[in-house]
């Protein structure tokens, strides 16, 4: 009987004080929720990416003392903005020519960047809590779409280039959980393009991606330490080696 009366109180406190209970997070993580079902049916490539990111981020957050269930939930929804233009994202291009072939670098960058804005709009339409929308806002921080920016620079050598045209709107991560999601998202996505899967390649990939994010000051507003980041790197490397069935070769 007490449990029955407790549920309305939980929702009341969440509305009044802006926090989310584990009960609410577990509900949002349910793969049968309308938005996650739409994600899995319409863009299965992005859905699988989100699942892998959720697994990476959850384990890392648990290890460094963050809210593992919160980051898992945020990870499941972070890319919902891709629903509007699924074919422009590599994980959804199965054996087909990329539609970016018909666009210039600025147009391509605009579409890629817009998945963050679209994601926020969709999240609000489905009444997702602000704490989950924060993961959508921050998962690219203020980084650039490096591939299209690099192509643009090659095409416009000697010209003054406005890099802001290729930059995500931010904000940068402002908590352990949002910082971990940014790392997990970039590492998981980049791991799919490795030409060779071995311990050296995975080590180099994880270090390069996260060190670049550090160099771009993406984590200066989050309460994450270098010790935390080293722990996160170790977990990502171990997880990726398991995912890609990499065997560790021991010296004879």
PLM regions and their residue ranges:
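Generic detector of multi-pass transmembrane helix bundles and their immediately adjacent loops
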Residues: 1-40, 44
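Short coil/turn segments at secondary-structure boundaries
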Residues: 25-29, 50, 87-89, 148-152, ...
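C-terminal domain-closing interface element
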Residues: 1, 5, 9, 125-126, ...
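In a subset of proteins, long, contiguous C-terminal domains/tails are tracked
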Residues: 13, 17, 42, 190-252
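Short, mixed-charge, low-aromatic patches
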Residues: 6-16, 31, 72-79, 161-166, ...
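Detector for methionine-enriched segments
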Residues: 1, 20, 76, 182-183, ...
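Divalent metal-dependent catalytic cores for phosphoryl transfer on phosphate-bearing substrates
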Residues: 36-49, 54-199, 203, 212, ...
């Amino acid at each position: 009987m007490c449990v029955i009366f407790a549920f309305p109180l939980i929702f009341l406190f969440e509305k009044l004080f802006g926090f989310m209970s584990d009960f609410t997070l577990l509900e949002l993580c349910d793969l049968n929720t309308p938005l996650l079902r739409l994600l899995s049916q319409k863009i299965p490539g992005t859905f699988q990416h989100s699942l892998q990111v959720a697994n990476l981020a959850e384990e890392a957050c648990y290890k460094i003392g963050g809210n593992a269930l919160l980051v898992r939930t945020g990870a499941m929804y972070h890319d919902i903005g891709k629903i509007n233009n699924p074919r422009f994202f590599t994980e959804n291009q199965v054996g087909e020519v990329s539609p970016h072939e018909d666009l210039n670098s600025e147009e391509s960058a605009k579409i890629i960047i817009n998945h963050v804005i679209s994601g926020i709009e969709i999240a609000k339409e489905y009444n997702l809590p602000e704490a989950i929308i924060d993961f959508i806002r921050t998962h690219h921080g203020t980084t650039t779409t490096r591939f299209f920016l690099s192509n643009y620079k090659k095409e416009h050598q000697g010209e003054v280039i406005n890099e802001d045209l290729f930059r995500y709107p931010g904000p940068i991560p402002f908590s352990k959980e949002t910082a971990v999601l940014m790392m997990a998202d970039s590492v998981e996505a980049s791991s799919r393009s490795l030409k060779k899967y071995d311990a050296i390649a995975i080590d180099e990939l994880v270090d390069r991606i996260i060190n670049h994010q550090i160099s771009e000051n993406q984590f200066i507003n989050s309460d994450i330490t270098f010790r935390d980041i080293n722990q996160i790197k170790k977990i990502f490397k171990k997880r990726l080696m398991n995912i890609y069935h990499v065997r560790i070769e021991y010296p004879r």
